[in-house]
Amino acid sequence: MNRDDIAVACLLRHKVDGYKLVVANAHFFWDPAFSDVKLVQAGMLMEELEDLYAKWSVKRKDEPKPSSPTAPDLSGKTALVVCVDMNSTPDSGVYEFLFRGQLGPSHPDFKGHRYGKYTEVGMSHPFSLRSAYAQGPSGAEILPFTNYTPGFSGVIDYIWYGTTGLSVEAVMDGPEAAYIENVVGFPDPHFPSEYIPQPTHTQTFHPSILNLFFLSLFVLSVGY
């Protein structure tokens, strides 16, 4: 099935200490009837990010040195953030794949179709990813929805971060329940999109210097 859904990725570098951040933004097919298409898109995205991450993580000889002589040299450290409108709820195969880092070849979301290695040996990626809005012991998503329309309300948009390089310091609450009770869906005069914003404040860390702020990232995940 030919789709025009896209993903973009960029490499950010902190001027002070050289810490690198790979940020990707992606959009998966919207139709809930095609969970298999979204799985394939997720697999392709993570394969490409794995290649880019490996390429961009290498410390080049011509790479600028940290601008501060007193700052630790973290130019060899790289973190990952993936902002994605998955059009998939937390009980989907796409969510399981990104969260667990692997998915079996016979997962029902493939719908019995054959997709080469994905349905022969399964899918996997090397990143330890967590959803920024899935906090606490249960790991459940704390927002009741990220998309709110008269016909649908649910969590389908996510900010995934690599736990080996980032930790979440704060996230913003969703719309107040009292307000939601009086509207049938978005957009409306106060919310210009059916997707709500998901600002996330993250902290980078180095294994030997925990809790030291090197970078404050304000990510806004917005649906298409």
Feature-to-residue mapping (PLM):
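Metal-dependent phosphoester-hydrolase catalytic domains
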Residues: 2, 11-13, 52-81, 86-224
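Beta-strand-turn-beta hairpins that frame and shape the catalytic cleft
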Residues: 3-27
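Alpha-helical elements of Rossmann-like donor-binding domains used by nucleotide-donor carbohydrate transfer enzymes
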Residues: 7-9, 40, 44, 97
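Short glycine/proline-rich turn/loop motifs
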Residues: 25-28, 181-183
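Short interface patches used for recognition in eukaryotic signaling and trafficking proteins
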Residues: 27-33, 81-83
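Active-site environment of divalent metal-dependent phosphoester hydrolases
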Residues: 30-34, 88-91
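Residues at alpha-helix caps and immediate loop-helix transition turns in enzyme cores, especially N-
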Residues: 34-41, 93-94
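Alpha-helical scaffold elements lining the catalytic groove of polysaccharide deacetylases
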Residues: 38-49, 168
